[in-house]
């Protein structure tokens, strides 16, 4: 089973006021078939942690690895989905999805075949030739997800991918993410500000403290796996335990913020 690990990582930035610690002694891992969600107040280092896992920046101390091999930069084994979809408006949907494969030297027929496969997976079959300005915000995020999936990475790293969507579209996208996870078995690391979203999607939930970001709690949750095993979403969200965990986490996050 593939595993992406951060071991005792810290990130310290230099500033005019002196050293600023964004993350302090954080250890966590994401394995195949897991959804690890990071939750915490703004500025707690969630995006910094994702940046380390993606290989966009090195830690000041500690180690990031995939299957024991050090992460020295971005790699095809880690696909990234951003809140801002970062699509290229001069390319149509299929060319956006296939762009990474094109940069890897994959031939046109092969990359388009792969792009069509992942577009079907994210329920965008039939939109291959549409321009980016012809599709909705939710569809744009699905294109971004398809682009990350096109290279068949072992891990998906998602930085608030649903944060800019309206409430109804966000609920549809949560279900889609779980459908994709169930179909692919990939390891997922996801950042969100939504407690309800975190409870629904996480198989492991990490609570980060306000700066410096430390993991102050870990929770194992089973709602995503219940959905993957066929339980209806309505049944899951109406479970009193879902509401109980949601409220307890809100209280915990409020306490963490008040203690700063």
From Swiss-Prot:
GO MF annotation: an example: ATP hydrolysis activity
Annotated residues for binding of ATP: 40-47
Keywords from the named record: ATP-binding, Cell inner membrane, Cell membrane, Membrane, Nucleotide-binding, Translocase, Transport
SMART domains: AAA
Subcellular location: Cell inner membrane
Protein EC: 7.6.2.7
Major subcellular site: membrane
Keyword field contains Secreted: no
Pfam families cross-referenced by the UniProt entry: ABC_tran
Catalysed reactions, as listed in the record: taurine(out) + ATP + H2O = taurine(in) + ADP + phosphate + H(+)
Enzyme class: translocase
ABC transporter domain location: 6-235
InterPro entries: AAA+_ATPase, ABC_transporter-like_ATP-bd, ABC_transporter-like_CS, ABC_transporter_ATP-bind, P-loop_NTPase
Domain of life of the native organism: Bacteria
Record-level GO cellular component terms: plasma membrane
Membrane topology: Peripheral membrane protein
Family classification: Belongs to the ABC transporter superfamily. Taurine importer (TC 3.A.1.17.1) family.
PANTHER family in the cross-refs: TAURINE IMPORT ATP-BINDING PROTEIN TAUB, TAURINE IMPORT ATP-BINDING PROTEIN-RELATED
Assembly and oligomerization: The complex is composed of two ATP-binding proteins (TauB), two transmembrane proteins (TauC) and a solute-binding protein (TauA).
Function: Part of the ABC transporter complex TauABC involved in taurine import. Responsible for energy coupling to the transport system.
Protein name: Taurine import ATP-binding protein TauB
The organism's taxonomic lineage, starting at the top: Bacteria, Pseudomonadati, Pseudomonadota, Betaproteobacteria, Burkholderiales
Gene: tauB
